[in-house]
Amino acid sequence: MFSSEDLKCLDPQYFSIITTDAYDVTIMSRNTGHYWYLHNPEYPDQGTVIIFHKHKASHPYHQHGRANTLRQAVRGIRKHDRWQMNGRKW
């Protein structure tokens, strides 16, 4: 479950926050326009976050990865944005 403290890591200047609740967060990166759906099923372990990603609103989501916390997931999204904006290379 995402707490109100967890949700504070979502910077509204960096992300367009589409929806949030106790188990799900949907955001769009203002830098790349990519959409991210973050789900916390609390199973098999509390704190697990499954990260889904899509490039356009009309595209389907694909699983991008997992994180231990919402903050860790957001760091990964920002890292992905840097990679994307750098011509998809490090």
Regions from the PLM with identified roles:
Residues F15-I17, V25-I27, W36-L38, V49-F52, ...:
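Hydrophobic beta-strand residues in large extracellular and virion-surface proteins
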Residues M1-G33, S58-H59, G87:
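Negatively charged, low-complexity tracts enriched in Asp/Glu with abundant Ser/Thr
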Residues S3-L7, F52-W90:
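Mixed-charge, Lys/Arg-enriched low-complexity segments
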Residues T32-H62:
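Short aromatic-glycine-(Arg/Gly/Cys) micro-motifs in beta-strand/loop hairpins
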